Swiss-Prot record:
InterPro entries the UniProt entry points to: 11S_seedstore_CS (IPR022379), 11S_seedstore_pln (IPR006044), Cupin_1 (IPR006045), RmlC-like_jellyroll (IPR014710), RmlC_Cupin_sf (IPR011051), Seed_Storage-Functional (IPR050253)
Organism: Arachis hypogaea (Peanut)
Protein name: Arachin Ahy-3
Keyword Disulfide bond assigned: yes
Region Disordered: start-end pairs: 208-233
Prodomain residues: 295-298, 479-484
Length: 484
């Protein structure tokens, strides 16, 4: 009898699980059926004291299909983007600038310790604590601080607090993609930033309210609107925070963001600059192009606490695909940066010369979010029915989602078309349809001739005329052979 009862309970769970999966599939089955794709620009900008954040509408069908959310932020001189964490893994590409960032991994020890006064091992500006003897105050200890520079890709796991700071005169410009459809996101597919400091607008909240995801005019909606703009600590009572942190109410009020100036926002300006505890060789390495790719680990076996969280894929690095007449492409996946396996993401950075082409190809196992960094390119995308769902110029500042298996090709309209593509698989693979070692290249000649109704010489040309793998130089520099 007990066994029958256990089997019945197990069967009920299986039915419920299957029902929930079916329900999710029914809700998502039409999200990737497009008659037309659209290049998107940000439609919201949130100004702060030290910079601004631009966001794209995550309710857009293309973003829903890819399971991603896109934003772009700019940090001015001495600007600090205050700590936050997200409900989904993210990748951040540094298009411009340099500075420092930190990730706070729960349970990992602080490995950076402030030196005893007078030590020259580390360099940081001196700080003065009112009413406290400098010799008696505790030394600062915290988790690792990382340097970043132009071209770096930063991996930020879900639920891990992140902050970033610009210590240079050049603005930091960064593009961020959240993988909202990740298995690590146990909430719905909507992007959420959990701010840990300040009192600012949640960058994606307005889209959530527009989509009607919240309870209609109910108690829950009123409560969320009442708390809009607060950080995580704002929702806790003064008593709880005072007890939890063992501090007085004056400190708690700042923790809750009660003494904020309206213009401060998510990005604040640090007067006199931030006091950052980092080894001096880091500063040197990030002032010299081509250096600074390593995190200066101490040889300890890599765990989540010591994991490498960034890799440079910019212009100064060696390319995976290179043609001096056409351009270059650099990729990063879990084999290059193992932490990407946890995120389920990878990335690609490309530079294509004017009139050169990235041949028709498709992503075998990932959706792709392309962001045009500089210049423009004529892009065509084709769906499973052979319909051209995109046939326009992708311009600087625009983004384009290319769903998995949709074929895509691009021809640069600028001296150098620069782009970054974020992909929803930690080991994303592409298959080229034309060129050397492509689908066409590897078909038997007879199959080509009979599949496309060609003479054998024509089939041979279709297979072999393009000796390039992915990037093809401008057409006027090539001899195109034809059959009379």
């Amino acid at each position: 009898m007990a066994k029958l009862l256990a089997l019945s309970v197990c069967f009920c769970f299986l039915v419920l699980g299957a029902s929930s999966v079916t329900f999710r599939q029914q809700g998502e089955e039409n999200e990737c059926q497009f008659q037309r794709l659209n290049a998107q620009r940000p439609d919201n900008c949130i100004e702060s004291e030290g910079g601004y954040i631009e966001t794209w509408n995550p309710n857009n069908q293309e973003f829903q299909c890819a399971g991603v959310a896109l934003s772009r932020f700019v940090l001015r001189r001495n600007a600090l983007r205050r700590p936050f964490y997200s409900n989904a893994p993210q990748e951040i590409f540094i298009y411009q600038g340099s500075g420092y960032f930190g990730l706070i991994f729960p349970g990992c020890p602080g490995t950076f310790e402030e030196p005893i006064q007078g030590s020259e091992q580390f360099q940081r500006p001196s700080r003065h604590f009112q009413g406290q003897d400098q010799s008696q105050r505790p030394l600062d200890t915290h988790q690792k601080v990382h340097g970043f520079r132009e071209g770096d890709l930063i991996a930020v796991p879900h639920g891990v607090a992140f902050w970033i700071y610009n210590d240079q005169d050049t603005d930091v410009v960064a593009i961020s993609v959240l993988h909202t459809n990740s298995l690590h996101n146990q909430l719905d597919q909507f992007p959420r930033r959990f701010n840990l400091a300040g009192k600012q607008e949640q960058e994606f909240l307005r889209y959530q309210q527009r989509s009607g995801r919240q309870s209609p005019k109910g108690e829950e909606q009123e409560q969320e609107q009442e708390n809009e703009g607060g950080n995580v600590f704002s929702g806790f009572s003064t008593e709880f925070l005072s007890h939890g942190f063992q501090v007085n109410e004056d400190i708690v009020r700042n923790l809750r963001g009660e003494n904020e100036r309206e213009e401060q926002g998510a990005i604040v300006t640090v007067k006199g600059g931030l006091s950052i505890l980092v080894p001096p060789e880091w500063r040197q390495s990030y002032q010299q192009p081509g250096r600074g790719d390593k995190d200066f680990n101490n040889g300890i076996e890599e765990t989540i606490c010591t994991a490498t969280v960034k890799m440079n894929i910019g212009k100064s690095t060696s390319a995976d695909i290179y043609n001096p007449q056409a351009g270059s492409v650099r990729t990063v996946n879990e084999l290059d940066l193992p932490i990407l396996n946890r995120l389920g993401l990878s990335a690609e950075y490309g530079s294509i010369h004017r009139d050169a082409m990235f041949v028709p190809h498709y992503n075998m196992n990932a959706n792709s979010m392309i962001y045009a960094l500089h210049g423009g390119a004529h892009v065509q995308v084709v769906d499973c029915n052979g319909n051209r769902v995109f046939d326009e110029e992708l311009q600087e500042g625009q983004s384009l989602v290319v769903p998995q298996n949709f074929a895509v090709a691009a021809k640069s309209q600028s001296e150098h078309f620069l782009y970054v593509a974020f992909k929803t698989n930690s080991r994303a693979s592409i298959s080229n349809l034309a060129g050397k070692n492509s689908y066409m290249w590897n078909l038997p000649e007879d199959v080509v001739a009979n599949s496309y109704g060609l003479q054998y010489e024509q089939a041979r040309q279709l297979k072999n005329n393009n000796p390039f793998t992915f990037l093809v130089p401008p057409q006027d520099s090539q001899m195109i052979r034809t059959v009379a």
